């Protein structure tokens, strides 16, 4: 059963499992990595969503449609809502770590659940963040290869990181095997049932559904730029996801270059992200 602590300003019910609510001391453990709408993981997430109800998670995650809810933003409205909920419950101490690509601990921060988490975030930025001072016309991005790109649901993480540096009207060349297709039933259903990407976003605004939330995250990107997908997915499935299928990266790149030249009358500015699931462009302009 759960204990009710109140409601956040954003309307998230703070309902926490009784064993945690009744504890004399609460200590949170976790790792800090980029999160595509909470900004970063770690910190307050040990309590919310870690020890909360499905309804609370849905309410908090519905804030993901805010323009400020993106990877690399320590003040994401999703993050701030989590921390407000955590203050209502109380989290006495945390230990948050940063991992390298081989899952080895390279940094640890401990103490207050906000201050220690922010400390770990800054260290994560030093390792995996990349400062950029202008947008690109074309971004070529890969999740980093198997087993991180088995389906489109997984590939969404790299796609979301690539959205930051691409200009409005630009092109993202997304590369991944996607041999398992869409990879998640609700994600696939929402894509197939929509006529336009905007319909997917509107659907999530009306009713938040896990799985559908990733479809909406992809659709938001598709509303502002083109996505060329180089994968093993059948062309019809790629088009059902509102993307353009290509057999090779070279073919996709040639098409993206031609599009830029046609629309802007100049050679494109390009960015390549071979480990797009791990690296986040930090836009500084």
Tell me what each language-model feature is.
Residues 1-40:
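An acidic, phosphate/nucleotide-engaging active-site surface
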């Amino acid at each position: 059963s759960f204990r009710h602590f109140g409601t956040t300003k954003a309307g998230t019910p703070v309902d926490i499992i009784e064993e945690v609510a009744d504890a004399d001391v609460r200590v949170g453990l976790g790792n800090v990595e980029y999160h595509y709408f909470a900004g970063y993981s770690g910190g307050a997430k040990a309590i919310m969503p870690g020890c909360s109800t499905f309804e609370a998670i849905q309410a908090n995650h519905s804030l993901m449609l805010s323009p400020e809810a993106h990877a690399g933003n320590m003040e994401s409205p999703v993050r701030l809502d989590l921390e407000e909920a955590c203050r209502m419950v109380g989290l006495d101490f945390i230990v948050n770590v940063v991992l390298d690509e081989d899952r080895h601990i390279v940094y640890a921060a401990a103490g207050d659940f906000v201050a220690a988490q922010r400390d770990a975030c800054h260290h994560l930025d030093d390792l995996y963040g990349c400062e950029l001072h202008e947008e690109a016309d074309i971004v070529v991005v890969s999740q980093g290869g198997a087993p991180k790109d088995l389906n489109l649901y997984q590939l969404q993480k790299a796609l979301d990181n690539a959205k930051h540096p691409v200009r409005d009207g630009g092109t993202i060349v997304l590369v991944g095997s996607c041999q398992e297709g869409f990879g998640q039933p609700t994600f696939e259903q929402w894509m197939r049932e929509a006529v336009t990407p905007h319909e997917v976003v509107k659907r999530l605004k009306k009713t938040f559904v896990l799985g559908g939330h990733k479809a909406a995250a992809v659709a938001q990107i598709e509303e502002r730029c083109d996505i060329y997908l180089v994968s093993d997915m059948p062309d019809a499935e790629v088009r059902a996801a509102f993307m353009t299928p290509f057999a090779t990266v070279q073919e996709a790149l040639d098409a993206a270059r031609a599009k830029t030249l046609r629309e802007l009358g100049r050679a494109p500015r390009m960015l390549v992200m071979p480990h797009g699931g791990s690296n986040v462009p930090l836009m500084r302009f």
